[in-house]
Amino acid sequence: MAKGVREKIKLVSSAGTHHFYTTTKNKRLKLEKLELKKFDPVVRKHVIYKEAKIK
């Protein structure tokens, strides 16, 4: 069976609350790091989430 192209990543909140989302991205097509605006339930606001590696 072939190895998958998608890689698991963690999106960490830039608000400093240590809240994160997990998702996957195509590592062959998207070489730059993801930055998405998502809801942070700790501060109850939409903030920027930046990509980090899952350890």
Curated annotation (Swiss-Prot):
A GO cellular component entry from the record: cytosolic large ribosomal subunit
Any one Gene Ontology BP term: translation
InterPro entries on file: Ribosomal_bL33, Ribosomal_bL33_sf, Ribosomal_zn-bd
Pfam families per UniProt: Ribosomal_L33
GO molecular function, one term: structural constituent of ribosome
Family from the record: Belongs to the bacterial ribosomal protein bL33 family.
NCBIfam families per UniProt: PRK00595.1, rpmG_bact
Name of the protein in its database record: Large ribosomal subunit protein bL33
UniProt source species: Baumannia cicadellinicola subsp. Homalodisca coagulata
